Swiss-Prot record:
HAMAP family from the UniProt entry: Ribosomal_bL34
Source organism of this protein record: Lachnospira eligens (strain ATCC 27750 / DSM 3376 / VPI C15-48 / C15-B4) (Eubacterium eligens)
A GO molecular function held by the record: structural constituent of ribosome
Keywords carried by this UniProt record: Ribonucleoprotein, Ribosomal protein
Biased composition (Basic residues): 9-19, 31-44
UniProt name for this protein: Large ribosomal subunit protein bL34
GO biological-process terms attached to the record: translation
Pfam families in the record: Ribosomal_L34
Amino acid sequence: MKMTFQPKNRQRSKVHGFRSRMSTAGGRKVLSARRAKGRKKLSA
């Protein structure tokens, strides 16, 4: 059995990136919550 995490930069940004977060209402909510918390890094 292989490891479950097979890192891919393209897939990472497609799923967790800034533009994908901005594209949905829920994603924008996530970003605003992270801004409110004061996160230095908002998305992957």
